[in-house]
Amino acid sequence: MSQVEAFSAAEVIAAKRDRHSLTDPQIDWVIDAYTRSAVADEQMSALLMAILLNGMESREISRWTDAMINSGERMNWSALTRPTVDKHSTGGVGDKITLPLAPLVAACGAAVPQLSGRGLGHTGGTLDKLESIPGWRASLSNEEMLKVLQDCGAVICAAGAGLAPADKKLYALRDVTATVEAIPLIASSIMSKKIAEGTSALVLDVKTGAGAFMSDPQKAKELAHVMVGLGKRAGVKTIALVTAMDIPLGLTAGNALEVRESVEVLAGGGPADVIELTVLLAREMLELVGITNVDPADMLKNGKAMDVWRQMISAQGGDPDAKLPTAKENLVITAPSSGTILSMDALKVGLAAWRLGAGRSRQGEAVQAGAGIQIHAKPGDVVAAGAALYTLHTDTPAAFARAQESLTNSVTIGDLPKDGKIDRLPLVVERITD
């Protein structure tokens, strides 16, 4: 016998179409009914578009998030003796920060249950990067996750199928219905998974600039405020940093390339911007869980963070000493003129890395572990005509032409302004606590 439904999809769609607030029972029902396929994709598509056009008030967003959490399981870390804290980034080009950050924060005394994702389009995915390490496993059971956390203090793995299943369905639908940009839907998608993950504290790294999902700083700040509010209402200590993604982070964009750079950072070296953001986020995470007597910068220098990295990779089946994959072919792109690099477009660099095979255009597509871009000079650097700007790496040489096309006009080279300043976003645009 079929279930008697509390509402009809049409009345919920009409309410939002006509700019009314959805009631808590309407929200609970529509998320549950969609998860069990009692609401069709066509109907949910119409509701998502109405939300995009007419928005949601904070109570609606909070209830929508709760309903998505309640569609699946909640993880429980009460068996751990350490406080739990996580970081979520909205993604960008060269954003490998999770790789050095999780072991660094664990080395300082917190537990970091980092449920990560795969890349899509020009933004890289943490799991794709780590899967370039021979033997490393992204899929762990809840019991395996707990064991790695107990033994190492940090785990980076894929979210299980039981975590916010409503979000998985909604995410796929938003992707094909031009409703990805709706801030209430972005915020609830991210926060439903993070709250269900069971962490007691969360630092959000909301990227802005050309290479970010939220390129407009005002929109990025709005998203950050909404997500911080959702976290706090759910009892999770939450803050957000809006950070720059106008130029790539570090000197690599790719999978194995970014793992190598992350290991350099854990060894006490690496690019200054990656070190700065990693340490900054580590301090924020530690402060949220009351660990203030350790300086994460010291843990990078003394090798403790590297020790945790090696343990964590080994615990997930990887070999921390294995040679990382390299691409079969490479091509150097040179500077067309002499001068100071005044700007670099992160989006163009990210698209080029994607075209070389470092990313995917559809969920489930394979990526090339060795593909990507090395960046030899960044804004503020002086270059001579003919000097190397980028080295492109791929297993498919036919991809070079399209990648080069993406990189056309990706840098501006000229004379430094009289005041000596380059017009770009500060690394941290804003810190948001409410």
Locations of the language-model features?
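Well-ordered secondary-structure scaffolds
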Residues: 7, 11, 16, 21-23, ...
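A glycine-rich helix N-cap at a beta->alpha junction
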Residues: 129-155, 225-231, 235
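Active-site-proximal beta-alpha loop/turn segments in soluble metabolic enzymes
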Residues: 48-52, 129, 167-176, 205-214, ...
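Acidic, glycine/proline-rich low-complexity segments that act as flexible tails and inter-domain linkers
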Residues: 2-94, 311-315, 428-434
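Short beta-strand segments
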Residues: 115, 149, 157-160, 205-209, ...
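Alpha-helix C-terminal capping segments
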Residues: 53, 100-113, 193-198, 233-234, ...
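Glycine/serine-rich anion-binding loops at beta->alpha junctions
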Residues: 83-106, 110-122
